[in-house]
């Protein structure tokens, strides 16, 4: 006997609409007899679907029949219309039956828009120095999107690139996308507080993200200038006195100038170095000039002058050698490695203890077989006040060598320089065979360059 089919809609189990994958919709008819059946498809407005239809062969199950029809539609044909469903028309036994098959909901997610700005030291190249603004739109769907840039509200026609839209997390539901656009800017425009806008257009909506430099011209009190006197180590090693002028809290190093001059106004050759950028976005810089030791020791005065566009007038800082303080030469003790350490056969530590000196400025170096060792080979502590002896200082320097070097009879020398020593320098030498330091008074490692006064 004839049995009419029961019909059911079929929808895709895949993630919601993307811009590439076809959308599968289907119609299932089952429990019918005899086996002759056909399907057609219409849009919601009754126009016929003529492409992408596939009807599968009829299957016999439990004495009756089952059949399915599938339609594959591109997202474009759905997204551009307002259809909420398709109509599956089942033709059986001279009768027709319509079944509404709902179109899968279109996932719509607005983009998250962020613009990343360059750090203060992020500009490079010849003037005008350049850097980049990076606009990132993430977590949006569907895929079609447009990114553009504005400068002070006017559309930027060139100088930017926009990467292809990419999938964020494959397999996620719904499928989301991201896109990155990069705009090249000049340091001058950035520091002049030009406002840059990343504009993102998606699904008829516009998303704007504005950025600009927040470093307005700083008041003059924000820029700080310090003078740093030459250290004894510099004087001892190079026979010249290096005057340092440290400038901090700079919003930019453009227009910065640091110059040194003598008390008579004679300019000194000044080397300027941009030191670093700080977490608060400011810069430090220093200007260094070398003068002869005699002028420094004779307490001649020198002046550092700093000019910058954020200063209403030049900053001037004066420096000269401080008045005499009580001088006392250091006592130097050289300690060989401890036997317990050597028994481990790993390393050997030679310690140079320097005590009872004043002023605190001192130089400590090491020699191996008479050759100067690089500073990376040893560690010297900063001078500390001597306990129970006000006005006096101590320090220690540790040289670590291999156990094999020590046992081979290598000689190690601690060289100490201090202005209260008769020849500015003294040294102690130790090796395995003696086990006791030997005292020498030398002036062998002072530089023969620089510092000559005329």
From Swiss-Prot:
Pfam families found in the cross-reference section: C1-set
Effect of residue 96 to A: Abolishes formation of 55 kDa cleavage product
One GO term (biological process): defense response to Gram-negative bacterium
UniProt keyword Secreted, yes or no: yes
Annotated PROSITE patterns: IG_LIKE (PS50835), IG_MHC (PS00290)
Modification after translation, per record: Cleaved by a non-enzymatic process after Asn-96, yielding a glycosylated protein of 55 kDa. The process is induced by other proteins, and requires neutral or alkaline pH.
GO CC entries: B cell receptor complex; cell surface; cytoplasm; external side of plasma membrane; extracellular space; IgM B cell receptor complex; immunoglobulin complex, circulating; membrane
Keyword Ion transport: no
Matches recorded under Gene3D superfamilies: Immunoglobulins
Region entry Important for oligomerization, spans: 324-454
Start and end residues of each stretch annotated as CH4: 324-435
Residues marked Cleavage (site): 96-97
Phenotype for residue 453 to S: Impairs dimerization and oligomerization
Residues bearing attached sugar chains per UniProt: 45, 210, 242, 257, 280, 441
Tissue distribution of the protein: Expressed in bone marrow.
Keyword terms of this UniProt record: Cell membrane, Disulfide bond, Glycoprotein, Immunoglobulin domain, Membrane, Secreted, Transmembrane, Transmembrane helix
Cystine pairs: 27-88, 135-198, 245-304, 352-414
Sequence segments annotated as region (CH2): 105-216
Subunit details: The basic structural unit of both sIgM and mIgM molecules consists of two identical heavy chains and two identical light chains; disulfide-linked. N-terminal variable regions of the heavy and light chains form the antigen binding sites, whereas the C-terminal constant regions of the heavy chains interact with immune receptors to mediate effector functions.
Chain's role: Constant region of immunoglobulin heavy chains. Immunoglobulins, also known as antibodies, are membrane-bound or secreted glycoproteins produced by B lymphocytes. In the recognition phase of humoral immunity, the membrane-bound immunoglobulins serve as receptors which, upon binding of a specific antigen, trigger the clonal expansion and differentiation of B lymphocytes into immunoglobulins-secreting plasma cells. Secreted immunoglobulins mediate the effector phase of humoral immunity, which results in the elimination of bound antigens.
Protein name: Immunoglobulin heavy constant mu
Organism: Mus musculus
């Amino acid at each position: 006997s004839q049995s009419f089919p029961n019909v059911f809609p079929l929808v895709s189990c895949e993630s919601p609409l993307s811009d590439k994958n076809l959308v599968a919709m289907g119609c299932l008819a089952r429990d019918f007899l005899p086996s002759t059946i056909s399907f057609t498809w219409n849009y919601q407005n009754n126009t016929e679907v003529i492409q992408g239809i596939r009807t599968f062969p009829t299957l016999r199950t439990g004495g009756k029949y089952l059949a399915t029809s599938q339609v594959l539609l591109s997202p474009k044909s759905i997204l551009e219309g307002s259809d909420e469903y398709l109509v599956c028309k089942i033709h059986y036994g001279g009768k027709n039956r319509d079944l509404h098959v709902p179109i899968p909901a279109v996932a719509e997610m607005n983009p998250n828009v962020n613009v990343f700005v360059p750090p203060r030291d992020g500009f490079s190249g010849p003037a005008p120095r350049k850097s980049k603004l990076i606009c990132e739109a993430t977590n949006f769907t569907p895929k079609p999107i447009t990114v553009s840039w504005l400068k002070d509200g006017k559309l930027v026609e060139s100088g930017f690139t926009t990467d292809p839209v990419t999938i964020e997390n494959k397999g996620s539901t719904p499928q989301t996308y991201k896109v990155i656009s990069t705009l090249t800017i000049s340091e001058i425009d950035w520091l002049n507080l030009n406002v840059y806008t990343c504009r993102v257009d998606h699904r008829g909506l516009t998303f704007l993200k504005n950025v600009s430099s927040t470093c307005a011209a700083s008041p003059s009190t924000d820029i700080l200038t310090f003078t740093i006197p030459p250290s004894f180590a510099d004087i001892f090693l190079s026979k010249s006195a290096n005057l340092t002028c440290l400038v901090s809290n700079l919003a930019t190093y453009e227009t910065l100038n640091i110059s040194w001059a003598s008390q008579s106004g004679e300019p000194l050759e000044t080397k300027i170095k941009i030191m670093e950028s700080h977490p608060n976005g400011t810069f430090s810089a220093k200007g260094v000039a070398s003068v002869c030791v005699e002028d420094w020791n004779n307490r001649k005065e020198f002046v550092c002058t700093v000019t910058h566009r954020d200063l209403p007038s030049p900053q001037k800082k004066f420096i000269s050698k401080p008045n005499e303080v009580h001088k006392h030469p250091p006592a130097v003790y050289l300690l060989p490695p401890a036997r317990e350490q050597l028994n481990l056969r790993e390393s050997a530590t030679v310690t140079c203890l320097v005590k009872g000196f004043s002023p605190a400025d001192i130089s400590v170096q090491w020699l191996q077989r008479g050759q100067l060792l690089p500073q990376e080979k040893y560690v010297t502590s900063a001078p500390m006040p001597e306990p129970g002896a006000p006005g006096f200082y101590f320090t220690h320097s540790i040289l670590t060598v291999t156990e094999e070097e020590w046992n081979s009879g290598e000689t190690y020398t601690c060289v100490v320089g201090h202005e209260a020593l008769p020849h500015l320098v003294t040294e102690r030498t130790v090796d395995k065979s003696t086990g006791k330091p030997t005292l020498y008074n030398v002036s062998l490692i002072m530089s023969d360059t620089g510092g000559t006064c005329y």
